[in-house]
Amino acid sequence: MAGFGAAPDFNEGSKINASKNQQDEGKMFIGGLSWDTSKKDLTEYLSRFGEVLDCTIKTDPVTGRSRGFGFVLFKDAVSVDKVLETNEHKLDGKLIDPKRAKALKGKEPPKKVFVGGLSPETTEEQIKQYFGGFGEIENIELPIDTKTNERRGFCFVTYTGEEPVKKLLESRFHQIGTGKCEIKAAQPKEVYRQQQQKQQRGGRGAVTGRGGTRGRGRGQGWNQGYNNYYDQNYGGYGNNGSYGDQDYNSYSGYDYSGYSYGYNPGYTEYSGQQSTYGKARGGGNHQNNYQPY
């Protein structure tokens, strides 16, 4: 067991993301966080209940501010029980609200990944060679810009099973050819559309124009705008939102849509709007009141 104050060695969120859409008894959702609470603060607090393998706090993709919730992965499921057995948790002057993280029922594990920031100099053979090292490839899609007739700065790789995807998602960035690419699980376009509709009802709408200018994509025309690929007819797939982390109405595989804390309006769905959760609470201990938990 990690002692209080110990910090686990991991790429933030990598282990949590690796098991999206799958039930993991060691995983927890942590709501009600102060906007000032850091990943280190949360890790140190929860380490008193058991060894923490991974921890991430979700932030607004535009402002970079904490959205007042996060996820933690314990090594042992018994640590989750210990957390839930404690009646009250207080961190940075706020009562926080830990819950078991439950995967969406009936959602199949992803077999397809989105590869963003792909240099046009990277050949199809290089792509096959790299991704083939993770498992058997069923298909590779290399979208072409219909206006320029040139390859776009992203691609899709579909595997015959879900295990290669889990391995890939353990790291967010991968060196492919001469460039550093970002890997995300691909989602069907209809799923993305539903998420965008919830975002717009929440008052923000879609966040656009960010994906193509992040990291190595900055200033490179071939890498501009691949955040919007879901609006093109490229196999009907999206990538969890506008190429960012604003999509948490179902947290890309965890059933938190309609998760109402009974505190403030604006935190009933994690669809990208700035959370008001953390500014005020309605009080009380709500250990068993939330669905779909």
Curated annotation (Swiss-Prot):
Q: Where is the RRM domain?
A: 26-108, 111-188
Concerning CDD domains, the annotation shows: RRM1_hnRPDL
One Gene Ontology term of the molecular function aspect: RNA binding
Its localization reads: Nucleus; Cytoplasm
Which key words are in the record? Answer: Cytoplasm, DNA-binding, Methylation, Nucleus, Repeat, RNA-binding, Transcription, Transcription regulation
One Gene Ontology cellular component term attached to this UniProt record is: cytoplasm
Q: Which Gene3D superfamilies did the record assign? A: 3.30.70.330
GO terms, biological process: regulation of gene expression
Question: What SUPFAM superfamilies does the annotation carry?
Answer: RNA-binding domain, RBD
Please list where the region (Disordered) is annotated.
1-21, 193-224, 274-293
- Where does this protein have compositionally biased stretches of type Gly residues? 202-222
- InterPro entries in UniProt: hnRPDL_RRM1, Nucleotide-bd_a/b_plait_sf, RBD_domain_sf, RRM_dom
Function (record text): Acts as a transcriptional regulator. Binds DNA and RNA.
What is this protein's name?
Answer: Heterogeneous nuclear ribonucleoprotein D-like-A
